[in-house]
Design a protein with these regions (language model features):
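A cross-kingdom feature marking charged/low-complexity
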Residues: 1-3, 7-8, 54-90, 117-118, ...
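A structural feature that tracks compact, well-ordered secondary-structure segments
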Residues: 8, 22-23, 27-28, 82-83, ...
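A cross-kingdom feature marking solvent-exposed beta-strand/loop segments within repeated
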Residues: 11-25, 45, 90-98, 117
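Generic "edge-of-domain/loop-turn" microfeature
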Residues: 13-15, 30-32, 60, 87, ...
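A short, charged, amphipathic alpha-helix used as a generic interaction element across diverse proteins
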Residues: 29-44, 104-118
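Conserved short beta-strand edge segments in small beta-sheet-based binding/regulatory domains
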Residues: 46-54, 120-128
Length: 177
């Protein structure tokens, strides 16, 4: 079983532009997460799609392992989403990254020194402690365990429009009626 971070896109009632959210889900392949993504999406199911996804296999010198056992390590997996502005653009810009650390204070400091360097008015938007804020237990009853690793492996981002198949959406909509 693999842990995925998924950047969702879609629409909600009364919105003028595409909306986004980042969620975490488990499966053997990304397609296994589709129903869970629909459960977690706040907007219109018919417009939900994946804009980016990544398997969280190695992060910050740690191997990410899903297990039935509660973690014994004090290290935690964090997702940081930092926002900032460029005076020449009409938008808030974001940069996101995954970190491992013992507490969010240290992680916030690391993020502020490595994300959106050189941008105006940088601020922290969302910080998630995956173990505490995202209930991994509810996605197949598995816990995130972090094992120190010497293996250096970059995350492989899968970027591009990936729609949730219509038959999955239809089945989901029937299940919630």
């Amino acid at each position: 079983m693999k842990l995925f971070a998924i950047y969702l896109g879609g629409r909600a009632i009364k919105c003028n532009t595409e909306l986004h959210d980042v969620v975490f889900s488990c499966g053997n392949k990304i397609e296994d997460t589709y129903k869970d993504l629909l459960d977690k999406w706040f907007g219109l199911p018919d417009r939900l799609h994946i804009d980016s996804w990544v398997e969280l296999k190695y992060v910050d010198g740690f191997e990410v392992v899903l297990s039935n056992d509660k973690p014994i390590s004090k290290n935690k997996l964090f997702f940081i989403n930092l926002g900032g502005y460029d005076k020449n653009k009409f938008e808030e810009l974001h940069e996101s990254r995954f970190f491992v650390g013992k507490d969010d204070k240290n992680i916030k400091l690391r993020a502020k020194h490595s994300l959106l360097v050189g941008f105006d008015q940088v601020h922290t938007d969302d910080i998630y402690d995956v173990d505490d804020c995202i209930e991994i237990k509810e996605v197949s009853g598995l816990y995130v365990n972090l094992i120190k690793s010497n293996k250096k492996e970059n995350l492989e981002f899968n970027n591009g429009y990936l729609p949730i198949p219509n038959q999955v959406i239809k089945s989901f909509k029937k299940s919630i009626l």
